[in-house]
């Protein structure tokens, strides 16, 4: 089982694909998501988003605020900017 993940900024789709784990920092603290996670919505703070792809590689992105949502093994990360 995998997560369908999309990381987008106002100007581009930064990353899209399947992952086994996603982590990010929200205003409520660090958050980790595995397949089967309950639905949630969070507000991102500036910091790292980590995506572990189904191939075992991990991608790290530095985001500047935004939103994080999980529903039915779909993770959407909408950020103001990515470095």
Per-region residue spans from a language model:
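Compact, glycine-rich, soluble single-domain proteins
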Residues: 2-83
